[in-house]
Design a protein with these regions (language model features):
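Charged docking surfaces used in two-component/phosphorelay signaling
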Residues: 193-367
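N-terminal Rossmann-like NAD(P) cofactor-binding subdomain of oxidoreductases
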Residues: 2-211, 242-243, 310, 315, ...
Length: 367
């Protein structure tokens, strides 16, 4: 490794899977982070031994330029777990592998006493692994103690971020849980970056809509129930309500996942109260003033033509949630539109915010 200077007090971070689109987002978002410094990048054997610039410059997919301080980091082989983990205090994992391989790799890193914050779906369903949207279920990180007992670790653990498809409508529904939503229909319109693609390498998406994204609808219907679940006897038990039905559609947009949402409640609130709750909602990250926490978390637009992906996806540096077009419905109580940035809030940025919460609550420290 060449040319990486660590500011005093910062935790050393490794990005495993750092050459892909989400890995690039992690590297970019952490460039000037006040708590974390990228010191190690790991990827496949094909990239190992090259500098980050040599490996990624021809396939850098972000609109911002590659951070100077990571260009000369020599990429390590992600399978060399002890070597990679020995250099860092924390790992962000964004590898593109089979699920069983990801599970084995992430658990191996955790067993080196290195906390792992994962962007992958492989560990979303073990009942002792917290799947966290920090504004919504920060209390679920308490399950880490049960997970550590299972893994036989004192410091290491795995925490995961939920699917990008749910990151707009679950935050919009959460401030309304006092009114007991019972039925939700969400149709998501998902950007091509959610597949790790740009228009340059996916020309088939130009002037095209694909009405199917493998596995997304199952994730979009089930993951919110774990997020709204409760910890009982060392396990996260899924919530039983609301009943959620989704359709997930790929649309020709670079970034930004939008959802058209329909919802019915046991106790129907009035429209003004819904908007008031959206605008007033503050989660633990906002109260703790975490570095990546957007203020406000949710923005409601009165204009009939908002939110829009190009105008609103970067709200709160890509971490804010945009909502609009709240109306009463003929079949459900209400309908509305919501929007989130899928590779920031829905991927790397959400992972960074989870790590900030874990550090603030004492689950991550320097080795």
């Amino acid at each position: 490794m060449k040319g990486v200077f660590i500011m005093a007090g910062k935790l050393k971070v490794g990005v495993v899977g750092g050459t892909g689109m989400v890995g690039q987002r992690f590297v970019a978002l952490l460039e000037n982070h006040p708590w974390f410094e990228v010191t190690t990048i790991a990827a496949s054997k094909n990239s190992a031994g090259k500098t980050y610039e040599e490996s990624v410059s021809h396939r850098w997919k972000l609109p911002t330029s590659m951070p100077e301080k990571v260009k000369n980091i020599v990429i390590k082989d992600a399978s060399n777990v002890e070597e990679v983990a020995g250099e860092v205090d924390l790992i962000f994992c964004a590898v593109d592998m089979k699920k069983d391989e990801i599970r084995a790799l992430e658990e191996a890193y955790a067993k080196t006493e290195t906390p792992v914050v994962s962007n992958n779906s492989a560990h979303r369903w073990p009942p002792d692994v917290p799947m966290v949207i920090p504004e919504i279920n920060p209390d679920h990180i308490r399950i880490i103690e049960a997970q550590r007992k299972r893994l036989g670790t004192k410091r290491g653990f795995i925490a995961v971020k939920p699917n990008c498809s749910i990151q707009s409508y679950v935050p919009a529904l959460h401030p309304l849980m006092d009114y007991a939503p019972v039925k939700v229909v969400a149709c998501t319109y998902q950007a091509i970056s959610g597949a790790g693609k740009t228009f340059a390498d996916w020309p088939e998406m130009v002037d095209n809509v694909i009405p199917y994204i493998g596995g997304e609808e199952e994730k979009s219907e089930q993951e919110p129930l774990k997020i709204w679940g409760q910890i009982k006897d060392g396990a996260i038990v899924k919530a039983e309500k609301p009943l959620i039905s989704t359709q997930c559609i790929r649309v020709p947009v670079t970034d930004g996942h939008m959802a058209a949402v329909y919802v019915s409640f046991e106790k129907k609130p009035d429209k003004e109260e819904i908007i008031r709750r959206w605008r007033a909602f503050e989660g633990v990250p906002q109260k703790l003033d975490l570095p990546s926490a957007p203020k406000p978390f949710i923005t409601y637009y009165e204009e009939e033509n908002r939110p829009q992906t190009r105008l609103d996806r970067d709200l709160g540096n890509g971490m804010g949630i945009s909502v609009g077009r709240l109306r009463e419905d003929t079949l459900f109580d209400y309908k509305f539109i919501s929007l989130s940035h899928n590779t920031v809030r829905g991927a790397a940025g959400g992972g960074v915010l989870i790590a900030e919460l874990l550090k603030a609550e004492g689950y991550i420290q320097a080795k």
